[in-house]
Regions:
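Hydrophobic beta-strand anchors of alpha/beta hydrolase catalytic cores
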Residues: 50-51, 81, 130
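Short, internal strand/loop/helix patches
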Residues: 98-136
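Thiol-/selenol-based redox modules, centered on thioredoxin-like
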Residues: 132-164
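A short beta-strand-turn-helix
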Residues: 20-23, 28-49, 73
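Short pre-active-site segment immediately N-terminal to redox-active cysteine/selenocysteine motifs
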Residues: 47-49, 54-57, 126
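Thiol-based oxidoreductase modules, predominantly thioredoxin-like and allied folds used
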Residues: 79-93, 106-115
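Conserved redox-active cysteine motifs that mediate thiol-disulfide chemistry
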Residues: 53-73
Length: 164
């Protein structure tokens, strides 16, 4: 991974296109939508992706969700949001995650990592963690912890040309 958007007022110094290193391809994985159908990250190829790992019991995850929901609506059809719930069946179940999303009225796409395949592929150690993946399927930036709407927009600007 190449760059971490910051909470500072300054925009990131460069995007992956300006870097001297070879960007890493984002690992593919399978998660499940609310209907139980499998969805792969590779299904999103050709569109930039904001990939967020979260759980309903996580206060920092809950704090950033209103901004994610609002911004996901603004970029619908242009940037894919994959809000991946860490559904381990113990501290987080399908029912608890679905109930939380429903009670808050969030409309962003939620996916369930019931096998921990995605969390393992991305080495998730803490949540929330967000990855910004370009339309070609390469990591551009990441952020660990709860992020503000401004930081989310800075990350999107690194993968979506219309707001760079």
């Amino acid at each position: 991974m190449t760059e971490k958007p910051t909470e500072s007022d300054e925009a990131p110094a460069h995007t992956h296109a300006d870097e001297e290193i070879t960007p890493d391809a984002a690992p593919d994985f399978t998660v499940y939508n609310k209907e139980g159908n499998p969805v792969r990250l590779s299904d999103m190829k050709g569109i930039p992706v904001v990939l967020n790992f979260w759980a309903s019991w996580c206060p920092p995850c809950k704090a950033e969700m209103p901004d994610f929901d609002e911004i996901a609506k603004q970029y619908e059809g242009r940037v894919a949001f994959m809000m991946v719930n860490l559904t381990d069946g113990q501290s987080e179940t399908l029912d608890s995650a679905k109930s939380f999303i429903s009670s808050m009225g969030y409309t962003f796409p939620v996916y369930f990592d019931t096998t921990s395949e995605a969390a393992y592929a991305y080495g998730i150690q803490s949540i929330p963690t967000t990855f910004f993946i370009d339309a070609e399927g390469y990591f551009v930036a990441y952020y660990e912890g709860s992020m503000s709407g401004d930081t989310l927009l800075r990350g999107i600007s690194m993968i979506y040309a219309e707001i760079q």
